[in-house]
């Protein structure tokens, strides 16, 4: 096997998986109190309003996102995360899944949650 093929296989093996769900399924996931609900938006966005039941806020755009997440979320935890519209949360989801967390990402983000009439704080 060539070195190029070995590199390709290693890259394929490194792909990370996380579930992308819509609002109703995200709400069902949140009903399990052991799930860590994580807001990955900026501090200003979080302060302006967040999904009721959010347990943790870590801005995915900050350079220390990974280290803060590992320090604050128990290894092996199920993490349900969201951002404003579903873009930044995919980045956070991939990062956390790569670290061994079971990750569920809200496809439509906080905006979709609000549009669905779900509770916010």
Regions found by a protein language model. Name each.
Residues 2-29, 43-78, 87-121:
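Rhodanese-like catalytic fold shared by cysteine-dependent sulfurtransferases
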């Amino acid at each position: 096997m060539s070195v190029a093929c070995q590199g390709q296989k290693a890259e394929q093996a490194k792909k990370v998986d996380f579930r992308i769900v819509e609002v109703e399924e995200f709400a069902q996931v949140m009903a399990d109190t052991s799930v860590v609900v994580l807001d990955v938006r900026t501090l200003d966005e979080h302060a302006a309003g967040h999904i009721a039941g959010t347990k943790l806020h870590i801005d995915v755009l900050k350079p220390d996102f990974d280290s803060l997440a590992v320090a604050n979320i128990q290894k092996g935890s199920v993490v349900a995360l969201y951002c404003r519209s579903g873009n930044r949360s995919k980045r956070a989801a991939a990062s956390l899944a790569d670290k061994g967390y079971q990750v569920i990402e809200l496809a439509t983000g906080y905006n979709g949650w609000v549009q669905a009439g779900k509770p916010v704080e």
